[in-house]
Amino acid sequence: GGGASYNLANAAGNTPSTSPSQGNNGGQSSAAVNGQEAGGGGGASAVGANGVAATAAGNGGAGTASSISGASVTYAGGGGGGSVSFTAGTGTANTGGGGGGCGYTYYGTAQSGGSGIVIIRYADTFAAAASTTGSPTITVAGGYRVYKWTGSGSITF
């Protein structure tokens, strides 16, 4: 869900409701006349933090860690809320994390979310793919075969 800006309602996450969840609610704004700080966007495993008037925008909600690639990586974190006093950051590449929001009307610029990733992992006792497109990274370790794309691609078994 998206974080709220000055005096606006935050957005709901996981709408419509699905299992597994598709994210959490965004945080509320500080709703102050001066020093409006937006709430952070909801992440995969936690709601976005509320903004604190004239102090700080809300952090994005935490993502979810997964070891499907062979190493623990956190995916789908929420973007930070916008502020009147700083420029937003971008989402981390290849994790699907949210980008930072912009501040009140004329301050700063909202930034892009992180690009996505597709990972397929299966036991290496099964045959390798017959073909792939899109130049995936392919690793075989720990009893698994892992195909990882950070752009368009396909796989045929």
Per-region residue spans from a language model:
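Low-complexity, glycine/proline-biased repetitive segments and flexible coils/loops
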Residues: G1-F157
